[in-house]
Amino acid sequence: MSLSIDVTSLPSISSSIFKNESSSTTSTLSGKSIGRNEQYVSPDIDAFNKYMLSKSPEDIGPSDSASNDPLTSFSIRSNAVKTNADAGVSMDSSTQSRPSSNVGCDQMDFSLNKGINVSASLDSCVSISTNQKKEKSKKDKSRKHYPRIEADSDSEDYVLDDSDSDDGKCKNCKYKKKYFALRMRMKQVAMQLIEDL
């Protein structure tokens, strides 16, 4: 998030609040070297207190303070303002109030009104392979293997129970003997489980 405050629009306030400190050494506020044509401004606490006390509470608005602590907000605002010592104009202000020469000015101009050209030529390739090896998951390994129930009764004298068949539709089914034997075995297993419970 970027907060820009135009100090030059308040000349009477900025002249009484800020005291200019020019230095060619490394600034503790920004951590970078300051050239001869640049200077940073720092807050004057007495001037700020005098300014805030001179205004009525109804006149104090968001432009005076961006936080609940006016002095903290004022300190943040003033430390963020970088000026040109030759012209005395804030570099963060509008383009019409900037000095005519760009010497000593740190500027970043964004020409967004001309449009943004984006080259969006995307090459996509999708390949689907269905020849994947089936891997056994851990869930399959952790499953309990119950004993298989096999019912083989191929003897000719085995009596089939047709009482619940579907009107004789399966009379010639070759799996009929195995089906009834398996069904009888399942009934016995179910009855045994019920008795055990």
From Swiss-Prot:
UniProt KW Glycoprotein keyword: yes
Cellular compartment(s): Host cytoplasm
Swiss-Prot/TrEMBL keywords: Glycoprotein, Host cytoplasm, Host-virus interaction, Magnesium, Metal-binding, Nucleotide-binding, Phosphoprotein, RNA-binding
Polar residues bias locations: 91-104
Biological classification of the source: Viruses, Riboviria, Orthornavirae, Duplornaviricota, Resentoviricetes
Protein name from the UniProt record: Non-structural protein 5
Record-level Gene Ontology MF annotations: ATP hydrolysis activity; magnesium ion binding; nucleotide binding; RNA binding
Modified residues (Phosphoserine): 67, 153, 155, 163, 165
GO cellular component, one term: host cell cytoplasm
